[in-house]
């Protein structure tokens, strides 16, 4: 929910003059279909660990308005929530990847979100989904437990995160014939210590993957450089930094192989 990525960029609502299908911009959906996006992750970025899913279900006029503290302090009206995201994935033809709130959420909140999305009708949580217009449960394979928890997702050290991750994942259960592929928050760039400590503490019973975070910026984090104004030298520096990710991945894989030689994660 950064800038106009969601609002205006993807979601314009049913009553917009911009051509749309169920609120999703037709031109954007068509472009994403042409690219062939296989998996779409939401809610992305730092917003994930301050997002509370119950704020984004039910009639839009009754949804809770919050301040998006990470991205501009703008008011987030939660008109794009779980049902809207699943509609977007359906239109694109891709798999949803849900990022659970570990930073400011609770185990119960995470568990009930999975139940809301994937459990057959019958429980109070699943029945609420039905009341909100979705009779059949969705198929949700990919579940990320926390986002960038070494930074905006809670400023955690890897030992603490691993402990919290294992606690959360224990209550993220398969519902019916929906089987979860649980993903732990991986390191920031070349933080090999994070990978080492995380891999010491988890195994395939806890996680199927870890997510590596890497950003290509021309300068440093405070002075990233312009996205539209740059010379040839700056362009090639950016490409060089982008290619460096291959070396970083290889070093993280070496650490993972030490603790997981069978490549279960």
Predicted regions located by residue number:
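Non-catalytic accessory regions flanking glycosidase/transglycosidase catalytic cores in CAZymes
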Residues: 1-209, 241-265
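Active-site clefts of carbohydrate-active enzymes
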Residues: 151, 221-239, 262-265
